[in-house]
């Protein structure tokens, strides 16, 4: 939607990812955009909240692509709500991934008593394209050490490993 040079886009993405608001403001102020667009870029990464946040996003300048992204988030929320997970969903527009293969929504999973993500993932349709197999994909990674730490902090039993298993695959 915004016409931004690749170097500026990468610098802005890095500032948002590191939550460096001062640097983000400097980068945005130097962009050849309207004041309204600059304000929107500065505000979006700071937005987070529940379902009502999605409605607020429609007030921002948007393109067909951003409108589609909001619609996608609303659909994901409806599905999660239908499974009874609405109390556990919070939208944070400041979460972005460093990898260029992500193509849609990204997420992080948290547990009570743990101040950092237990898992993270998202939609990454470009990942397999990098290996010559274009295909849509969604997935996540779960931090085993973080899972064990969460179990320990919540008074759960941390099982002792009994056997090591190795799985290999090849053609």
Regions found by a protein language model. Give the residues of each.
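Positively charged, Gly/Ser-enriched RNA/tRNA-binding surfaces
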Residues: 1-10, 23-171
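Short helix-adjacent coil turns
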Residues: 18-19
């Amino acid at each position: 939607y915004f016409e931004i040079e690749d170097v500026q886009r990468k610098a802005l993405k890095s500032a948002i990812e590191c939550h460096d608001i001062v640097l983000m403001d400097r980068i945005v102020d130097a962009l050849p955009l309207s004041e309204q667009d600059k304000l929107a870029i500065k505000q979006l990464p700071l937005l987070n909240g529940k379902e009502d946040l999605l409605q607020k996003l429609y007030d921002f300048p948007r393109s067909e692509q951003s409108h589609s992204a909001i619609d996608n988030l609303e659909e994901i929320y409806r599905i999660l709500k239908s499974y009874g997970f609405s109390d556990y969903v919070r939208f944070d527009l400041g979460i972005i991934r460093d990898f260029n293969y992500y193509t849609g929504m990204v997420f992080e999973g948290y547990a009570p008593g743990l101040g950092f993500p237990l898992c993270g993932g998202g939609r990454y349709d470009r990942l397999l394209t990098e290996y010559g197999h274009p295909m849509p994909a969604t997935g996540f990674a779960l931090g085993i050490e973080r899972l064990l730490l969460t179990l320990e902090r919540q008074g759960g039993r941390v099982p002792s490993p009994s056997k090591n298993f190795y799985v290999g695959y090849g053609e």
